Amino acid sequence: MEDEAVLDRGASFLKHVCDEEEVEGHHTIYIGVHVPKSYRRRRRHKRKAGHKEKKEKERISENYSDKSDVENADESSSSILKPLISPAAERIRFILGEEDDSPAPPQLFTELDELLAVDGQEMEWKETARWIKFEEKVEQGGERWSKPHVATLSLHSLFELRTCMEKGSIMLDREASSLPQLVEMIADHQIETGLLKPDLKDKVTYTLLRKHRHQTKKSNLRSLADIGKTVSSASRMFSNPDNGSPAMTHRNLTSSSLNDISDKPEKDQLKNKFMKKLPRDAEASNVLVGEVDFLDTPFIAFVRLQQAVMLGALTEVPVPTRFLFILLGPKGKAKSYHEIGRAIATLMSDEVFHDIAYKAKDRHDLIAGIDEFLDEVIVLPPGEWDPTIRIEPPKSLPSSDKRKNMYSGGENVQMNGDTPHDGGHGGGGHGDCEELQRTGRFCGGLIKDIKRKAPFFASDFYDALNIQALSAILFIYLATVTNAITFGGLLGDATDNMQGVLESFLGTAVSGAIFCLFAGQPLTILSSTGPVLVFERLLFNFSKDHNFDYLEFRLWIGLWSAFMCLVLVATDASFLVQYFTRFTEEGFSSLISFIFIYDAFKKMIKLADYYPINSDFKVGYNTHFSCACLPPDPVNLSVSNDTTLAPEDLPTISSTDMYHNVTFDWAYLSKKECVKYGGKLVGNNCDFVPDITLMSFILFLGTYTSSMAMKKFKTSRYFPTTARKLISDFAIILSILIFCVIDALVGVDTPKLIVPSEFKPTSPNRGWFVPPFGGNPWWVCLAAAIPALLVTILIFMDQQITAVIVNRKEHKLKKGAGYHLDLFWVAILMVVCSFMALPWYVAATVISIAHIDSLKMETETSAPGEQPKFLGVREQRVTGTLVFILTGLSVFMAPILKFIPMPVLYGVFLYMGVASLNGVQFMDRLKLLLMPLKHQPDFIYLRHVPLRRVHLFTFLQVLCLALLWILKSTVAAIIFPVMILALVAVRKGMDYLFSQHDLSFLDDVIPEKDKKKKEDEKKKKKKKGSLDSDNDDSDCPYSEKVPSIKIPMDIMEQQPFLSDNKPLDRERSSTFLERHTSC
């Protein structure tokens, strides 16, 4: 430890914070020595320089004696309201602030074993509790583990643990290959330091090497070899004078103790299913506590091995042991020993102390870690909380990065968008994105996108080798097919079949497959959108009224629009995306989600109108309800003597032949056939079709409900984790299959999916290629630039807003975005679709969000009680590419797809609309309008923004959304893309209505021109700021620094924090332990 820095305790009260250069070489700099660069800054209050220098000299000359503590305490008491840097915090700063190349410390499994008597005779180590993140206890008499719960500790046990660490043996980075060798080493160290009498070594060794019984083992059925064998307890064995010489006694002890010890894990350990909860590199921390009758003072040892070693059956699971804490004490204090064991086990499961335990260099580092824990611990009044109540683990754990970062001296860790800039509510502004930085060069952004995505091109294919990708393909395929059929049908009605269902299938397949293969963000799904449909209808009517060739006019609009998009790509216009804040994103995505929900119910209501319910039907008068087909009045074909035809023969005969050459029985005609051939439907039941509407709504709501339920099944308590995850991943596919089977079993003739079975244009008046000239006057080619401007705005807004939503920080995408590359391919595909007279395609918000949700990854191993952590999204190109290839092949799968009821697919539409609204802050704020104040959730923005301001912001967002909805439903829908662009202007105007503080929580702060310069200044200020002041402004980026009161544990000590390690007065130590603590 000669190279370790010596820390001047007095320096910590001078409000000095070391910069990175000083911290980097702290092993060779003596902090107490005057360094001009370090001490140029002075305290804010006025003091005489001579007095300050005098105090520094006194501290150095007295070798950091106790007097310095008293002086510092007096000084701190005079300025207690000013932020202080405790010596423990300063020490932890050096421990956690070290930059080494070693990997992060592994996950720890902590096990608490207590020395208990079995059958009143044998003493064994019995496992009573275990920790990974939360505590699990062995239920008394239940032979089962308790549910994971938050460990509640008594404050007294933490102080006793601190005393144990001060007085016991601390052995760091020791080497041992077996448990007997390790126990021997600990006993010898205790004897060398005078903490253990030599004649007690054998007894301690015998006790520590007793058999370990874990909860996974069943009741012990003794074998024949064990019958008659009795092993006395340590006290009786050593108290018997007939045991022979000490040497013989030692041999007997060793042989009997080592019977159950093996360096290899047992079969029960290898079969333990609890290993699934641990990562592969996990290590163990064993805590052994118990009471014995041969010790007068506690036997305390904390050991950290240089390398983790497998110590046989010491641990419940077959993981190597790194830490060992031993506490053996006199009889009568078993409860105190148990609580101390729980305290050290809980500390080892704490992320900050866990890192300190791995990096500690001496006893004082460990004590500083305990002091840091005590600084953060929360105390509950004894009369207001029952400690026997087990606290359920929270759904989301607070990140320890804030605590670690406070000591590491680094910048604020950006996790999931929770930075000071965005107020900790995720979805931060886009000004920091590298993808949105304007290069100022021709096609600079496009070139950077290509360079950024090219290294990941190969991994975009093999990263899809997971069963989760299969479920995503099937789910998105059915959603895409349904959308293509729906849009194709509407487009056919709007354009007189110049573009129909087949064109929709072909365009979706070609555009989507090419985009997913080469675009910057392959997770984005291309589809036709409502605004595009409105534009196509208006364009067709305009061409029809002015005798223009619709497809040629549309071709030139597409070419002009593609050219404008390419100009936007070349000029890096995508940097404007940084002005699309949460307000714009949520307004647009919520509108699209509401459209999906509205269309799903609209289609079901239309279906109910087509197949109405007979509300006047009465069971007692069922003879009054009938329907018959009568022949037309001029000719009565039903009474002819000619041949009568069966209904199945009718479709092959023309109506003319039927009327003049043949006769048939009208009573056998179907409803459609009767109307087709001029018959009359007579009866009061002719307008009603029984059960179809009711069955359709059952399929519709059943598909939606089961999809939602099975998607949430991952967090349920039933079935193993693997089964729950599999059901959740295939939730939508399973729902579709289940209700298709139900529909087939019931046998009601519900409307089914209709897919074109022939590959040819829908209209015979068009081909697969549109000539650019010949159909319209020459000037139409130039005039097409005007409507093309509207299309360009629509394409740009739709594409980039969806791209922003897909690339949100909370999705944790690792391969980067490609805004310019995406828009480039949309423009190229627009040219292709214009020449082939196929629909135009752009990013679809709801389906893209559904695609991302179906590919989300979570941790495979999570501690009991801990929610699986979201790792990111499986970024690849395979799912999207295969979805669109299957869409193109759907023409050949018509015989299979025709069995899928349309209400089932409408239920999938409803699910996608509702699912895409989950987690949207706008929806959370809408719910607040209906909640009483006391029942409102603890959202971060409710802590810092007055509720009336929150409601005002929500009202303005609802107003904009309502205007957009009204606009899209009227003839003025042609300017819909312009109004979406107007959302950005509305958000800019909110800067005059709301403060930047409020907007930083409710929305994103719009980036400023000199933002980078301001951020650099902010970083410099952070380096100069006080380390120990509370960082509550991380939740409140615009709040003022508020002084905090910190009373560090070290001020209360009698011993200097970093003085030379002097031998402890053993008698005084023993007296102190007996009088004040269980240790």
From Swiss-Prot:
Keyword line: Cell membrane, Glycoprotein, Ion transport, Membrane, Phosphoprotein, Sodium, Sodium transport, Symport, Transmembrane, Transmembrane helix, Transport
Any GO MF annotation of the entry: sodium:bicarbonate symporter activity
Description of activity control: Activated by cyclic AMP.
Expressing tissues: Isoform 1 is specifically expressed in pancreatic ducts and acini. Also expressed in parotid acinar cells and in the colonic crypts.
Any single GO BP term: sodium ion transport
Cytoplasmic side: 1-466, 521, 572-585, 711-725, 808-819, 856-877, 919-960, 987-1079
Feature: compositional bias, Basic residues: 39-52
Record region (CA2-binding): 1002-1004, 1030-1033
Residue stretches of biased makeup (Basic and acidic residues): 53-70, 1062-1079
Residue(s) carrying Phosphoserine: 61, 65, 68, 223, 232-233, 245, 256-257, 262, 1026, 1029, 1034, 1044, 1069
Cellular compartment(s): Basolateral cell membrane; Cell membrane
Processing after translation: Phosphorylation of Ser-1026 by PKA increases the binding of CA2 and changes the Na(+):HCO3(-) stoichiometry of the transporter from 3:1 to 2:1. Phosphorylated in presence of STK39 and dephosphorylated in presence of PP1 phosphatase; phosphorylation seems to inhibit SLC4A4 activity.
Membrane topology: Multi-pass membrane protein
Complexes and interactors: Homodimer. Interacts with CA2/carbonic anhydrase 2 and CA4/carbonic anhydrase 4 which may regulate transporter activity. Isoform 1 but not isoform 2 interacts with AHCYL1 (via PEST domain when phosphorylated); the interaction increases SLC4A4 isoform 1 activity. Interacts with AHCYL2.
UniProt protein name: Electrogenic sodium bicarbonate cotransporter 1
Gene coding for it: Slc4a4
